[in-house]
Amino acid sequence: MSQDTEVDMKEVELNELEPEKQPMNAASEAAVAMAVAGGAEKNGLVKIKVAEDEAEAAAKFTGLSKEELLKVAGSPGWVRTRWALLLLFWLGWIGMLAGAVVIIVRAPRCRELPVQRWWHKGALYRVGDLQAFQARDSGDLAGLKGHLDYLSTLKVKGLVLGPIHKNQEDDVAGTNLQEINPAVGSKEEFDSFLQSAKKKSIRVILDLTPNYLGQNSWFLPTQVDLVATKVKDALNFWLQAGVDGFQVRDVGNLTNAALHLAEWRNITKSFSEDRLLIAGTESSDLHQILSLLESTKDLLLTSSYLSASGVSGENMKFLVTQYLNATDSHWCSWSLSQAGLLTSFVPAQLLRLYQLLLFTLPGTPVFSYGDEIGLQAAALPGEPAKAPVMLWDESSLPSASVSANMTVKGQDEDSGSLLSLFRRLSDQRGKERSLLHGDFHALSTGSNLFSYVRHWDQNERFLVVLNFGDESLSARLGASSLPAGASLPARADLLLSTHPGREEGTSLALEHLNLEPHEGLLLHFPYVA
């Protein structure tokens, strides 16, 4: 064995004995020291690599220095690359800007929205007899306030109330248009009701037909000047009280009606553009109706025009298109009479069809209380035809022969009821621009079919198809003579049907559109440029 080997062996033995001489806590200190040194322990030996680690570290790339980086960045290749990227960036930015300008310039212009008053945005709801509407012995303003929540669910925009003023039958002196009938309530109760209605976003229109309890609604022709003065004073009084509009009925019996209507409309308009005047007439003659409308373009007129002749699709198309063409730019109102119920003029099987019709024609639909549930005018024997008791629940039923599903409560729980249809149509009428103020185009379909398109600018289009007949019919609505902006597609989606059995959302081919008897369809399709 060589001398060097002997020395190494001695060092190994000393290293093996060294841990035995160390205290117990020295082991951890040694481990820490070895970890710091980067070595590993095996059988008491510590392997330390110093020179090799430093050489490896020196060989690793640490990046370019500032001077080296500037030198490389200034080389011709990198300079050309930077200029190319900068040029591409600005060319791309200018291209996107030019594209945006072209899109804006070539995009079709949006039509300017027409001026919309509150009565343009939804239906009006008439309550002429408070006691009959509430179906209780005490039909007063306080009780009517409790039904405002129900009116809110119908999404009507205005309540046509009364007449509720003091009227001594056929006695001008005993009639006070500024005083509320004590049986209905007091001025304070009316003010409270008015405030509650405004909180529900329901406008109140007061009926000021003077002699509503007498033989002639406007007294004698010789008293017309006195009555007209009373009406003018009443308009100013109730406008100051916060009423949103007025209705006067039977204006066909009023001497110089057009002259007085123009004067009364000037009073309401001078107070505020947001005040409404409604005139009612039982006339169905278009010439008489137009003579009344000529007095002022801001007048709503309810009449018996739509109920004048037999029920058929062809006849309804003629009446509607004739009326719209004759009134031109005048805002229309749609009803079947100035005060009566739908059931007084329409068979029960057509009630749903007429609801769809009135809600989708261009203008303001006007309904009487009970129209939403199909209330019959002869619900109670002996009651006046225009004052049937409203059927709220089973307690309102006049007899056991009347079904509970004719009540508000019964229909409220049925998604396929007439009441549910009324609410859905009222909701659609109030939120779709094409139904609010869109253009109207009637289509040629058949003798018992009436169909038309409602459209506005680039908004959703609506197609209404009504079958007034007693038999199933097939409508062919493919090609039509409509303007380009209102042309029909090959298919349209079903929004709702007056017959609950239809599956909503179904895409229907317009070339072969089958309808059941007395069925109405409301379809929609998107605007295509």
Curated annotation (Swiss-Prot):
Residues 1-20 are annotated as: Disordered. GO terms for molecular function: aromatic amino acid transmembrane transporter activity; L-alanine transmembrane transporter activity; L-leucine transmembrane transporter activity; protein heterodimerization activity. It is found in: Apical cell membrane; Cell membrane; Cell junction; Lysosome membrane. It is a single-pass type II membrane protein. GO terms for biological process: carbohydrate metabolic process; L-alanine import across plasma membrane; L-leucine import across plasma membrane; L-leucine transport; phenylalanine transport; tryptophan transport. Its main location: membrane. The keyword Transmembrane applies. Keywords: Amino-acid transport, Cell junction, Cell membrane, Disulfide bond, Glycoprotein, Isopeptide bond, Lysosome, Membrane, Phosphoprotein, Signal-anchor, Transmembrane, Transmembrane helix, Transport, Ubl conjugation. The chain crosses the membrane at residues 85-105. Pfam families: Alpha-amylase, SLC3A2_N. SMART domains: Aamy (SM00642). Residues 7-20 have a biased composition (Basic and acidic residues). There is a cross-link at residue 66 (Glycyl lysine isopeptide (Lys-Gly) (interchain with G-Cter in SUMO2)). Glycans are attached at residues 266, 325, 405. Signal peptide: none annotated. Residues 1-84 are cytoplasmic. The modification Phosphothreonine is found at residue 5. One of its GO terms (cellular component) is lysosomal membrane. There is a cross-link at residue 49 (Glycyl lysine isopeptide (Lys-Gly) (interchain with G-Cter in ubiquitin)). Phosphorylation on Ser-307 or Ser-309 and on Ser-426 by ecto-protein kinases favors heterotypic cell-cell interactions. N-glycosylated; N-glycosylation is crucial for trafficking and stability of SLC3A2 to the plasma membrane. Belongs to the SLC3A transporter family. Disulfide-linked heterodimer with a non-glycosylated light chain (SLC7A5, SLC7A6, SLC7A7, SLC7A8, SLC7A10 or SLC7A11). Interacts with TLCD3A/CT120 and ICAM1. Constitutively and specifically associates with beta-1 integrins (alpha-2/beta-1, alpha-3/beta-1, alpha-5/beta-1 and alpha-6/beta-1), but minimally with alpha-4/beta-1. Interacts with LAPTM4B; recruits SLC3A2 and SLC7A5 to lysosomes to promote leucine uptake into these organelles and is required for mTORC1 activation. Acts as a chaperone that facilitates biogenesis and trafficking of functional transporters heterodimers to the plasma membrane. Forms heterodimer with SLC7 family transporters (SLC7A5, SLC7A6, SLC7A7, SLC7A8, SLC7A10 and SLC7A11), a group of amino-acid antiporters. Heterodimers function as amino acids exchangers, the specificity of the substrate depending on the SLC7A subunit. Heterodimers formed by SLC3A2/SLC7A6 or SLC3A2/SLC7A7 mediate the uptake of dibasic amino acids. This is Amino acid transporter heavy chain SLC3A2. It comes from Oryctolagus cuniculus. The gene is SLC3A2.
